[in-house]
């Protein structure tokens, strides 16, 4: 992500009027604060439910994909508890920082951690979806590509990277000696840091995800043309043909389920970039054009785009759970809703699943 080098986007709204806010701008700030409070409430409630559902459901907890979703929910939860409340605080006190400089650095560091960790979690989920479609029999092998242990290791690497990268300004790569100046808490980062962060934490993951979904599209096209079944037949010749042939018969059904899961992940990815792309583009424009561009844009625009970015943390939980039966069943149990005692076929189908099948529960 990209950030302004001398102040956060939302505090730029206050710099347009030295003698106080106009009536219309003051009203906009109040409305923005109300919307942000609503986003915080929904983001905390929704992501806590997602985390509780994954921890409380053995099938969800055993899925590598769901571990990535859990990590993404933690990112959104941290944003809603450690970053957004300070934005509300700033609006309520006319963008004057009334806390310590240490708390200012803690706020900006928390922001620098949560947003990149979200996009990197989305990247590893997309890579996992691509790999599951590229090698549909991976779940049946003795060692599938993405195991639970590997997923935990990847998640740890994502968080370590995000934390270390966010701490670089605190450790010395600063724009100026102090983060609090003129009673404002500023993002004390250099232009070079912002540009590097843009490439590593936004542009590169975006291009990588585009690559993965392009490959997924090509796999789907090959399936429709019948090319993929030939490759499966060849694989069945080379390793345990008798065993694989029985499982290959179920390949198309599993492929459809994995493809549906990939589409649902794509919706989550699209929502993230829809919410954060405008904020990032505006930040880059302000970095390369200088502060003179502030006189050419509406004063409400920076805070409005930041609000749109924060909205993503509240949108994700419904996107995770809308098409997932395990989530719905877990929520029903949590809230005391009982399922109708019918559907014997579904029950028998579930018991027919092997333990390896159950580890492949995805967003469907």
What are these regions (language model features)?
Residues 204, 208-209, 274, 280-283, ...:
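Seventh transmembrane helix
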Residues 36-39, 53, 78-94, 108, ...:
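Helix-to-loop junction signature of class
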Residues 25-33, 61-125, 132-143:
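Extracellular TM2-ECL1-early TM3 structural module of rhodopsin-like
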Residues 44-55, 80-85, 113-137, 156, ...:
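Cytoplasm-facing ends of alpha-helical transmembrane segments in multi-pass membrane proteins
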Residues 1-45:
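Extracellular N-terminal segment of 7TM GPCRs
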Residues 12-22, 91-110, 135, 143-154, ...:
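Loop architecture of class A 7-transmembrane GPCRs
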Residues 43, 121-135, 169-173, 198-234, ...:
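Class A (rhodopsin-like) GPCR signature focused on the TM5-ICL3 interface and adjacent 7TM helical core
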Residues 1-20, 141, 224-262, 267, ...:
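Intrinsically disordered regulatory tails of 7TM GPCRs
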């Amino acid at each position: 992500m990209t950030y302004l080098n001398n102040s956060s986007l939302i505090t730029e709204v206050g710099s347009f009027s030295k003698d106080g806010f106009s009536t219309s701008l003051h009203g906009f700030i109040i409305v923005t604060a109300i919307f942000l409070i609503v986003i915080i409430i929904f983001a905390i409630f929704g992501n806590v439910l997602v985390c509780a559902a994954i921890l409380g459901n053995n099938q969800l907890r055993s899925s590598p994909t769901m571990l990535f979703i859990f990590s993404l929910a933690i990112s959104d939860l941290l944003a809603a508890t450690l970053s957004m409340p300070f934005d509300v605080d700033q609006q309520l006190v006319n963008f004057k920082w009334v806390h310590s400089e240490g708390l200012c650095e803690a706020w900006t560091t928390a922001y620098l951690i949560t947003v990149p960790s979200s996009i990197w979690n989305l990247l590893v989920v997309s890579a996992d979806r691509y790999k599951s479609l590229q090698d549909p029999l991976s779940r049946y092998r003795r060692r599938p590509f993405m195991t639970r242990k590997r997923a935990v290791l990847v998640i740890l690497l994502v968080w370590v990277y995000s934390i270390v990268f966010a701490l670089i300004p605190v450790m010395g790569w600063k724009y100026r000696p102090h983060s609090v100046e003129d009673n404002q808490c500023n993002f004390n980062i250099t232009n070079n840091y912002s540009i590097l962060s843009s490439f590593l934490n936004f542009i590169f993951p975006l291009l990588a995800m585009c690559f993965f979904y392009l490959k997924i599209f090509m796999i789907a096209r090959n399936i429709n043309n019948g090319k993929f079944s030939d490759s499966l037949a060849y694989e069945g010749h080379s390793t345990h043909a008798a065993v694989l042939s029985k499982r290959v018969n179920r390949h198309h059904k599993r492929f459809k389920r994995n493809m549906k899961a990939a589409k649902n992940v794509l919706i989550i990815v699209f929502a993230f970039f829809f919410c954060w792309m405008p904020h990032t583009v505006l930040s880059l424009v302000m970095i390369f054009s200088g502060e003179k561009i502030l006189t050419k844009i509406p004063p409400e625009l920076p805070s409005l785009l930041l609000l749109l970015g924060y909205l993503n943390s509240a949108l994700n939980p419904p996107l995770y759970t809308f098409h997932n039966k395990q989530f719905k069943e877990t929520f029903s149990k949590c809230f005391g809703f009982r399922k109708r005692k019918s559907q014997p076929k579904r029950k028998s189908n579930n018991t027919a699943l092997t333990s390896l099948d159950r580890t492949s529960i995805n967003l469907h």
